[in-house]
Amino acid sequence: MLKPKIVGIDLDNTIINYNDAFKYTAIKLNLLSKEWVKSNLLSANGISPKNLIKKHILSQNGGQYNWESLQGQVYGNFIHHAQIFSGVANFLLHCYSRGIKVFVISHKTKFGHYDKYKTSLREAAMNFLEQNNLLSGAYGLSKNSIFFFDTREYKVRKIAELGCNYFIDDLPEVFLEPNFPKKTEKITFNPQGQFSYENSFNTWHEINKYFFDNIKLTDVSAYVKGGLNEEVKTVKKIMGRANSNVFKIEMQTGKKYAGKLYPDSTFDQRKRLK
């Protein structure tokens, strides 16, 4: 198991999955038809919906303007159609329960291109993280641990300044920046499988396994506290089978539960406590 002290993570397309937001917003702004989305995105092998939409829009008249306008709307007014990538919350919980500090370091401008309403993209992102409970305190993140920068160069400087042992990003270009710190391990989030770099992972499930090869009682406690929004008094392992572990869980209120934990389900969207 790795023993990092500080982990940095990119935000857009690493923590936040914008694929559905791009589809919805492109249709809403009449840049794509529902028929085009249905016929093209279902057969897109190895290409994300975002990149397929980008390629199509850029091939049209006024493509650059339309694409940049679309980005601004997706990251601002329509960000509520995005999701948190499956497995991100688990990773944050695992870090928090082990005392590993996590920072989110993002290359994100204040405003989107051609947005006459001047919607703050940074405020929109913060609000989105709050609405998805990532800033609730249960995951070790707060507004003070999230940083935005206008350029990739300043983003890389912050990674070095914070002393990140690892940095997770979907863009290999970040790791190619001349001032990217040599002591920071590069982890590429690669959901479409288009890269073949060392330490490249298609899912957050795989990233979790890379960092954490075992589940601790403190992890189980964090799962229950986050799911029930109650303080946990004790967690004890009471038995195990080939594919699961069972725990006796007592809350501070005196309520007691039996929790069954499946190895794979600790990294997917199903409820962990049964």
What are these regions (language model features)?
Residues 6-7, 166, 257:
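Structural motif
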Residues 2-65:
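Active-site neighborhood of HAD-like aspartate-dependent phosphohydrolases
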Residues 72-104, 120-123:
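Short, acidic loop-to-helix structural element flanking the phosphoryl-transfer center
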Residues 257-274:
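A conserved alpha-helical element in kinase catalytic cores
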Residues 100, 116-219:
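C-terminal cap/substrate-recognition subdomain and adjoining C-terminal extension
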Residues 11, 70, 104-110, 190-191, ...:
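Short loop/turn segments at strand-loop or loop-helix junctions that form parts
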Residues 215-230, 235, 266-271:
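Regulatory N- and C-terminal appendages and interdomain linkers associated
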